[in-house]
Curated annotation (Swiss-Prot):
Residues 510-585 form the U-box domain. It is an enzyme of class 2 (transferase). Putative E3 ubiquitin-protein ligase involved in the rhizobial infection process. Plays an important role in the early steps of infection thread formation and in growth and differentiation of nodules. Its EC number is 2.3.2.27. Pathway: Protein modification; protein ubiquitination. This is Putative E3 ubiquitin-protein ligase LIN-1. PANTHER family: RING-TYPE E3 UBIQUITIN TRANSFERASE. It comes from Lotus japonicus.
Length: 1485
């Protein structure tokens, strides 16, 4: 399907495909800064190589220098733009970069500048211009420049600039060319094979690309191959250019218009049509085509006859190409050929392990151009730098004795042919006879005398008789034996004699410096290249390590490998060739004290850097690669040497094998369990005595023996036997991976080991670890409690046997894999299992050991991330020095884990505890922790930068912030830059979380409760109280008050420091970043950003003003108002209100508020019942001179309820979401007023006449009626119930009551007071009372004559509170009294256009008046407004705080008298009763 799209996709599909592919490629490059830097260095290496190959005396012209400088400046400016988050600066740098890069992009590709092809510079410029247009979000131009890059220089674009993109866009079209090349290559190689009828060789198609065949070619054959390679590369380039132009035309052609013809799809034609369809899979490096190494510059033409030798010499020190290929090509990512169903090919591919296939050909081969063509050279030296269990390579193993070094071409040809036949037979045979072990009659001497021919003795493990052997295991255990010492420094390497002789590397009096050991100063005899890239003599570096050193002598980088890698054979061959041409210098600089062959001894090669129990590196689970590498190096085929001190003699091997046979027979055939158990003990003893001899291990690795040992594990109950069986299996697995595969092939084997582990056999953890189970297997058996037990308990030592890995280390490695696998729920569940098994204290204690320390930190980190509550447990027990030591000595990955661990650890619920840990981190260690963190921050990947920045900032703020601190500046800059990463929302979210945790409000469960704390400040304390109740943060039974006071002071001080540093960094740049985050479409991010912004603005006004307040207001005010208007979340609205409250204290904010006053005022009215802050803002808005308060008023009639059948609505009262109305016929109705339209829930008729008055106090309702009774009611959610009836013998016209007494008005003058038990008392002041109001022990009576009497209820005395101006005409009366917030509102007849007055009860004076020409009969007051009802059916509305009239409501019934008036508590609804028996409901929006 990879190529079918050529015929299926129309132009729109192609444009969509290009957009997706190129955009993804460019996006990946922009994300990966390290890759861009490495790519620039590699291109610079090619430029430097070209410069070095030219004439040293040639002077580069100034114009050429300027062009190269423009390219460099353009790339630099582009990189600065990528790293800049200020948009103005970014755009300016992008403009500058475009100008610089366009200079090189427009160069004539057919010319050169300073020896560099213009096409190379132009393609490089187009690549960077593609980056540039992607940053400008112009996809069209981005794709155009990317395609232009392939048009200008398809070759170098394919190998240097964009190999991944070439693979996606062009490779699917090249299948016919690749097929042609493969067929031609096949034809040439068949001429090389001595016996072309050897079908076993042709069975493996990849062998035709093996350079061992190239090295055996004759000159005329090599010339043909070179021309083929050249023609193949040219075909790929031409067709790449052809398709790039086609893609470009598709992008520029408008499919919806007929103005431009639709481009025609090109066809990639090979130079010659293949005769047959290709049915084989092709290695990736073949599809990729010829490659020119960076160090070769741009020299596609031949330089000398010995270019191949130069190329080989280059490979000793260069590993860039392999790294590139590994990152681009998969192990078997092939073109889908015409015949996709070829079963032979599939079986053959499946029989070879993918990792080993990758190691043989794909990453390890180059195609080097020389004399106009290419040949491939193996990068075996690179494998030595990164050891791995590679498949046997013909370039590494065949060796000849010194007496066979004669440069006789016939002999060489013969030897190569024999070797090829032997190799083909190894590949052909599915099973190999184990004659070595069953009949140990072959000796080293016999092999030496067999015509000095190279023989391959197989030591291959079977799984079962019907199973096909895996090729990687077969090759991994091959032993190559020859007839003499294997010291490579003796006499050359035979296979290289087919190549031209090496030219002299040095014309001086000294050998090349690459041939000399920097420690001994002598020419290498046995060179080993360490992981740092430095090469040393094996004995010298072993002595260096034996003295206790753990770092590279030159680079001082720590060495993680536990044993030395293999010999650098490529360098060794170069040295041998140089010695032949410079015998005198070789003799002078050779180490005469080093015996010949001594460095080849396995006792020298395989000495581990750690003890036997420390064979693994920092952790036994070091990604399993170190373990495999260690096993591969320890059991290398070094037993072929004849040195008597290196391995057991052959006679000893035969003796041990003969001794093993009866016990093996018992183990595999006997049904007597004790006999089998005894056999196991004997086998273990003999295995130990063999001193890890590979032949003995091979003999014991048969599937039948493995199955016998597993049966013992299943059947035996003897712990010693079980542990010994595990020891044997562990040793065998350590030697041979096929043993592990044999065990893994049967699920019950793993189940058996899991059962043993659960039953308390600690050693079972070691075997489980060596089997490398997947997460699903571990999870299914629930091994965590058992693993914790292994770590906790002291393991029993095997008497005479030493395990390859400590079971505790293995258990920790398995525990780490279990905790890091699965989804978030699984990780949380597994972490809880570790905590519940009491594993935390043991793991913390285990940190004291160096082995497994990284895994322990990783496990503890997983526990803290999954279960935040365990942080305190870890913090109280941990010693931080081991973690800091691990950070200082570890690689980037380990450092990242340590930083994440420390960052999580300081997120405790007490600030004092956090500060103590921070002090420990700061003061521990021999190095400056803060400086180390700073250095790591500057090179750490993005996922770790936030953690180290947070940690570094907290360490810096332990002391009072100084005026300037590089640590603080770098940390804050990192956090703020992360907030600008709008294309990476995860990074923004992590930055917000880090900043919220920096504030310090953290619960005992490890969560930030800054939001709840801010809501509490705003008056909405329900979330905070609920959190405190659940978390019990406010309850510290064992803490002293002084301690909690210290904690409070520490937290307040910390908040001020954090707020000061964040707000004042670069003049409030964080507020600009938060402004962008608040615009995010992610609700979670916007919420976190709002919390942080609210906290910062709240703290900002507690700090001295440094000019940042204005920046914060300009950045956040509009966003906060937008949240207030548009958000549907109550908490968000309250947070926005709190932030707005801090801004309104600044007078400059008032003008901005005027624009939004009307829209936010309504929202604030709804919020005032939840937040007192809303009330404060409303007051500010109402007091703004520029705001017309009448514009803020809005109301709407909701419903009119017709109750005329019950007569007039004489009284109403609002209580707990219910409205109660009293009617003329004695009915009391209870309404559910929680919704906009009230609903009757109860109707009572216990009064026989009109209910004239209703009032409430507490949970009691009091009703007065003309039937001469006062009734007391209980109020419930479903209605009212009468509990007392008082017959007072006279009609009640007005009533005010509470639980102590009742005051009522009857027909006479004065007022009567009834204490519920005695007879009513009359307080007569010779005036008719029209209204009553009670406040404490004072009763206020609105009387005729426009006066107010005050009655002292404790003494039953009265006095005049207010006497109004009387008029000669008409009666003036106080019709209604209301007490609200210590103010007495008195309304009645209009006198001098004033119908109401407001009195301060504390000052007993008039503080305001209500101006209207109408008499007011009823009054209602809520928190915002005063409502006054008149007898003509209108309601006048005033602002309660300013006594300013804002509106007038006209009743629908015309001039109907308003008889009752009431508003709800929230001030959102108004209920009006009238004389026509109707109730109108108004919504006050």
């Amino acid at each position: 399907m990879a190529r079918n799209f050529r015929f299926m996709m129309d132009q729109k599909d192609i444009v969509r495909f290009l957009t997706t592919t190129v955009d993804s490629f460019i996006q990946d490059r922009l994300i990966n800064k390290e890759q861009r830097t490495q790519h620039k260095e590699q291109c610079a290496e090619r430029l430097a190589a070209e410069d070095g190959s030219g004439d040293k005396d040639t002077e580069v012209e100034y114009s050429d220098q300027a062009v190269l400088a423009n390219l460099d400046w353009g790339i630099e400016a582009l990189e600065e733009a990528i790293n800049t988050y200020n948009m103005e600066t970014k755009l300016a740098r992008l403009d500058y970069a475009e100008k610089m890069l366009q200079v090189c992009a427009m160069l004539n590709p057919k010319q050169k500048i300073a020896g560099v092809p213009n096409s190379y510079l132009s393609a490089w410029a187009h690549l960077n211009l593609s980056y540039l247009w992607k940053l400008r979000n112009n996809v069209q131009n981005c794709i155009s420049h990317a395609l232009e890059m392939f048009i200008v220089d398809p070759f170098f674009t394919r190998i240097d600039f964009a190999p991944e993109l070439w693979k996606s866009l062009f490779l699917p079209h090249m299948s016919s060319i690749v097929g042609w090349y493969s067929e031609e290559r096949h034809r040439l190689m068949m001429e090389v094979i001595p016996d072309s009828a050897d079908l076993s060789f042709t069975a493996d198609f990849e062998q035709f690309f093996n350079e061992s065949l190239v090295l055996t070619m004759r000159p005329h054959q090599l010339e043909k191959l070179q021309k083929l390679e050249q023609l193949y590369g040219e075909s790929l380039d031409e067709n790449t250019k052809l398709y790039a132009k086609y893609y470009n035309d598709c992008m520029n052609s408008d499919s919806s218009s007929s103005k431009k013809a639709v481009p025609m799809l090109p066809i990639a034609e090979p130079p010659m049509t293949p005769l047959h369809e290709l049915s084989r899979t092709i290695p990736d490096f073949v599809k990729f085509g010829p490659i020119l190494p960076k160090s070769a510059g741009f020299s596609l033409a031949p330089r000398s006859k010995d270019v191949l030798n130069e190329t080989i010499r280059e490979n000793v020190t260069s590993s860039n190409l392999k790294e590139e290929k590994l990152s681009i090509w998969g192990a078997k990512d092939t073109i889908i050929e015409e015949n996709e169903d070829d079963s032979d090919s599939e079986l053959e591919n499946e029989s070879v392990d993918s990792d080993d296939k990758n190691n043989i050909f794909s990453p390890g081969m180059k195609m080097m151009k020389y004399e106009g063509v290419e040949t491939k050279v193996d990068l075996s030296c690179q494998r030595n730098q990164i050891p791995s269990p590679d498949i046997f390579s013909p370039l590494d193993s065949p060796r000849t004795a010194p007496n066979n070094s004669s440069p006789n071409p016939d002999m060489h040809s013969k030897r190569d042919s024999k070797f090829l036949r032997l190799s083909s037979s190894r590949i052909r045979e599915p099973t190999i006879s184990d004659s070595l072990t069953s009949s140990p009659d072959i000796s080293i001497d016999n092999i030496s005398n067999a015509d000095n021919e190279v023989m391959v003795l197989k030591n291959i493990q079977r799984k079962n008789d019907n199973q096909t052997l895996s090729m990687n295991h077969e090759n991994e255990n091959s032993l190559i034996l020859n007839g003499s010492s294997l010291c490579e420094s003796d006499d050359g390497y035979q296979s290289f004699n087919s190549l031209p002789k090496l030219e002299k590397l040095s014309m001086g009096s000294k050998p090349p410096k690459d041939f000399v050991c920097p420690i001994t100063g002598q020419i290498f005899c046995d060179p080993v290249t360490l992981e740092t890239g430095q090469t040393y003599e094996r004995k010298a570096i072993q002595e260096w390590l034996r003295t206790g050193n753990t770092t590279c002598p030159i680079t001082r980088q720590p060495l993680s490998a536990s044993i030395l890698p293999k010999t650098n054979y490529v360098l060794k061959r170069l040295i041998t060739s140089w010695k032949e041409q410079n015998p005198e210098l070789a003799q002078e600089f050779s180490n005469v004290n080093t015996p010949r062959g001594s460095s080849c001894s396995p006792s020298a090669k395989d000495i581990p850097m750690l003890s036997t129990r420390q064979r693994t590196t920092d952790s036994p689970n070091h990604k399993n690669k170190d373990y495999a590498r260690q096993r591969s190096n320890r059991f290398m085929p070094a037993a072929i040497t004849t040195s008597p001190t290196s391995v057991l003699s052959q006679a000893a091997v035969e003796t041990i094998v003969n001794s093993l046979k009866p016990y093996i027979s018992s183990l595999c055939t006997s049904e007597n369990l004790p006999e089998c158990e005894e056999a196991v003990l004997k086998i273990a003893r003999l295995l130990k005595d063999s001193k890890t001899n590979p032949q003995i291990h091979s003999y014991l690795s048969k599937p039948t023996i493995i199955n016998g040992l597993v049966e013992i594990l299943s059947a035996s109950r003897n712990r010693e036997v079980l542990r010994t069986s595990i020891y044997i299996l562990s040793e065998l697995i350590f030697t041979d991976d096929s043993v592990a595969e044999t065990l893994n092939s049967v699920d019950s084997d793993f189940d058996c080991l899991a059962t043993l582990l659960k039953n308390g056999l600690a050693e079972a953890a070691l075997l489980i670890y060596q089997l490398r189970p997947v997460f699903a297997q571990l999870s299914a058996h629930e091994l965590i409690p058992s693993l914790v037990d292994v770590i906790q308990n002291k393991n029993e030592e095997l008497d005479d046997f030493q395990l390859v890995i400590d079971p505790k280390d293995a258990a920790i490695a398995i525990l780490e894999q279990t905790l890091m696998g699965g989804d978030e729920y699984s990780r949380s569940l597994n972490a809880s299992s570790v905590i519940s098994a009491n594993g935390i204290p043991t793991l913390v204690k285990y940190l004291e050991r160096m082995e497994g320390r990284r895994s322990v930190v990783s496990v503890l980190l997983c526990c803290m991330q999954a279960e935040k509550s365990c942080k305190n447990l870890i913090a109280n027990r941990i010693e931080l020095s081991p973690v800091l030591e691990l950070f200082h000595s570890g690689n980037d990955s380990v450092r990242g884990t340590c930083v994440e661990f420390l960052s999580e650890l300081v997120q405790l619920n007490r600030r004092t505890s956090c500060n103590q840990i921070l002090h420990t981190i700061k003061d521990e260690g021999a190095f400056s922790t803060m400086h180390t963190f700073l250095v790591y921050l500057q090179m750490a990947p993005m996922e770790h930068q936030l953690a180290v920045a947070s940690l570094l900032l907290q360490l810096d703020l332990l002391a009072e912030p100084r005026k300037m601190s590089i640590y603080r500046e770098e940390a804050v800059e990192t956090l703020i830059e992360a907030l600008w990463q709008k294309d990476f929302s995860n990074t923004q979210m992590k930055a917000l979380d880090a900043l919220l945790f920096l504030i310090g409000h953290i619960s005992s469960s490890g969560k930030s409760y800054t939001e709840a704390w801010l809501l509490k400040i705003a008056g909405f304390d329900q979330p905070y109280n609920a959190l405190m109740k659940v978390e019990q943060l406010g309850q510290h039974d064992n803490d002293l008050i002084e301690t909690m006071e210290d904690e409070k002071n520490a937290l307040n001080s910390w908040q001020k420091r954090i707020a000061s540093v964040l707000c004042n960094h670069e003049n409030g740049s964080i507020f600009k970043a938060l402004e962008e985050c608040l615009k995010s479409n992610s609700l979670k991010m916007a919420k976190s950003c709002l919390v942080l912004a609210t906290w910062l603005t709240h703290m900002l006004y507690t700090l001295p003003d440094t000019g940042v307040r204005d920046v914060a207001r300009k950045s956040l005010l509009e966003e906060v108002i937008n949240v207030l208007q548009s958000s549907k979340n109550l908490e968000e609205k309250i947070l926005a209100t709190l932030a707005l409250k801090t801004f309104i204290s600044d007078p400059s904010t008032h003008e901005a508020l005027r624009v939004y006053a009307k829209s936010i005022y309504r929202t604030l009215r709804r919020l005032k019942k939840y937040s007192v802050v809303a009330v404060d803002i409303m007051k500010v808005i109402l007091n703004l001179k520029s705001v017309d308060v009448t514009e803020l008023w809005s109301c709407k009639e909701v419903v009119e309820l017709d109750l005329s059948s019950n007569g007039e609505v004489l009284s109403m009262v609002y209580l707990n979401g219910q409205v109660l109305s009293g009617h003329t016929d004695g009915t009391i109705k209870v309404w559910d007023a929680r919704k906009r339209i009230p609903r009757v829930i109860q109707e009572t008729h216990e009064h026989t006449k009109a209910v004239t008055s209703l009032c409430s106090s507490g949970d009691r309702l009091y009703s007065g009626s003309l039937d001469k009774t006062i009734r007391v009611w209980t109020i419930k959610s479903d209605g009212i119930k009468c509990i007392d009836v008082y017959d007072i013998k006279e009609a009640v016209h007005e009533l005010a009551a509470n639980d102590k007494l009742a005051c009522y008005v009857s027909q006479g003058t004065g007022v009567k007071v009834f204490n519920w038990s005695e007879a009513p008392k009359l307080i007569n002041f010779s005036k008719y009372v029209k209204s009553l109001a009670v406040a404490g022990d004072k009763l206020y009576c609105g009387c005729s004559g426009y006066s107010i009497q005050e009655v002292d209820l404790s003494t039953y005395t009265s006095n005049s509170f207010f006497t109004g101006t009387r008029k000669l005409l008409g009666k003036q009366t106080i019709h209604s009294l209301q007490i609200h917030d210590d103010y007495l509102f008195a309304c009645g007849s209009s006198v001098d256009a004033t119908a109401g007055k407001i009195f301060s009860l504390s000052q007993k004076m008039v503080v305001g008046s209500l101006s209207t020409g109408l008499d007011i009969h009823r009054i209602a007051i809520n928190s915002d407004f005063i409502f006054a009802g008149t007898k003509f059916g209108t309601i006048e509305v005033w602002l309660k705080d300013k006594f300013t009239r804002v509106a007038s409501i006209k009743m629908a019934g015309g001039h109907t008298k308003i008889t009752s008036l009431v508003s709800d508590v929230d001030g959102m609804m108004l209920f009006v009763g009238s004389s026509d028996g109707k109730i109108q409901v108004w919504a006050l929006d």
